[in-house]
């Protein structure tokens, strides 16, 4: 092999490596946000199983996001950290040429109002690398504002989006390593307040008070989405089932506010409801629970994608 040929190979290799690096840095990391920006519905499941086998199964499931429920499962940060590492698909990273996870991990924390507890729990799950938080039982605008602030770092003095002032303590080493980026602090802000942000602060509306206050809640700067909890909502309204017409009316009230303000809205679904919910305007939905995709969840995922044209 001649000297010129060797130099050509080195030059081409350098160009390819540079292209991969640029692609990885420019690529949107949070797939759910990318789908929102492209007006495409997203599909996920609830996860209560922190095992490595389930992590691998979920990472290759074909879903868009994983709703890791730490409200109704143990709040165990070390198990969460190992679970996230288990979802890392190195082959996919190489094949795609970017660092975006195929399935975005999001966490619902247990705290439902206590400020100190909420801030601490949000900080801990963010510090291991999740891409967003579901905050349960949000009834008021003040709760939503606190949730957004707990998700953000304090901004630099010249930041155009300084408010709502962040409360998250800064020690991003684990999250930075998991995301695979050096500019974690710059990218770990809430979307859509920061258009380049990769974090989602999402509020669960699951009470009569939450429905009544939805217009105030939904206009909080930094709010990234609304998730309607039909079961708790029906209980809050005094009904034994989400099928009650009054509960569905409340669901449509929240959805209508989301559509009016262009805020992504989510709800739990199954085979019998996923197509209807997508047609109604829900932007992201869960289609079942984890442990691998069972037949019902797989069918719901298929029907949802067909309804969404994906």
Language-model features: where?
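Bacterial N-terminal signal peptides
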Residues: 10-20
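Bacterial N-terminal signal peptides that target proteins for export
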Residues: 1-12
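Expand to "…catalyze enediolate/carbanion chemistry for C-C bond making/breaking, isomerization
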Residues: 24-310
